[in-house]
Amino acid sequence: MFSPGKRNDLSAKEFRKKLKLYSKYNNLFFASPSRWLFDCAKESLLTKNKPVFYIPNILDNTLFKPIDKTAARLILNVDAVETVIAFGAITVSSPYKGWTYLQKALELLKQDDSLKNISVLIFGSAYNKEIADAIPFKTRFMGYLLDEYSTSLVYNAADVFIAPSLAEAFGYVVMEALSCGTPVVGFNVGGIPDMIRHKENGYLAKY
């Protein structure tokens, strides 16, 4: 199916089909939510000769906004004295979500005896025993959150949000957490650097 260099490779077929389609229209425009995706489009053989615009995604900041951390923790039944690390993914085990990197980071934190009362909040996915057993701190799985208010509560209850994604066209969770006033740690990949200002509202790690 995927055989690089071969004419009948599926990706080559899709490329030719798209190239034929795009060449039919002179008024075809492309919009990118991140500078990274914008640069990719400008370099692509499919779109480099087409107008490409960088238009960041928007967010309803009447829903995602800072609220009192103590109140958020009270609603979620999270201990007020804990240092809370939040992480969100529909499929935690997806290699693109960077779970293995977060796991290693948590193991390093555990080795620091000066750090006490750390807990981890995971939302977006159901309880996963393998993941839970791999985390050296108290962990709560919040499940799939059905509304923005509940998601906002998690961001506000957290001291830091971790976005270890290895591939992200934009990264809505990053924007949501920052809009709630919660610093974000993430890799300098995809659209994440568009939102995290290194050591100002978060930390950009090299990948």
Residue ranges, per PLM feature:
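Membrane-proximal helix-turn-helix segments that form the acceptor-binding/catalytic region
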Residues: 2-30, 45-46
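Acidic anion/phosphate-binding donor-loop and adjacent secondary structure
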Residues: 39-43, 59-75, 131-132
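Conserved donor-binding/catalytic core segment of Leloir-type glycosyltransferases
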Residues: 78-97, 103-106
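Nucleotide-activated donor-binding/catalytic signature segment of Leloir-type glycosyltransferases, i.e.
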Residues: 113-117, 124-152, 156
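A short hydrophobic beta-strand element within the catalytic core of glycosyltransferases
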Residues: 161-162
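Aromatic "clamp/platform" in nucleotide-sugar-dependent glycosyltransferases that forms part
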Residues: 166
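Short acidic/histidine- and often glycine-rich active-site loop of Leloir-type glycosyltransferases
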Residues: 175, 189-199, 203-206
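Short hydrophobic beta-strand element within catalytic cores of glycosyltransferases
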Residues: 183-186
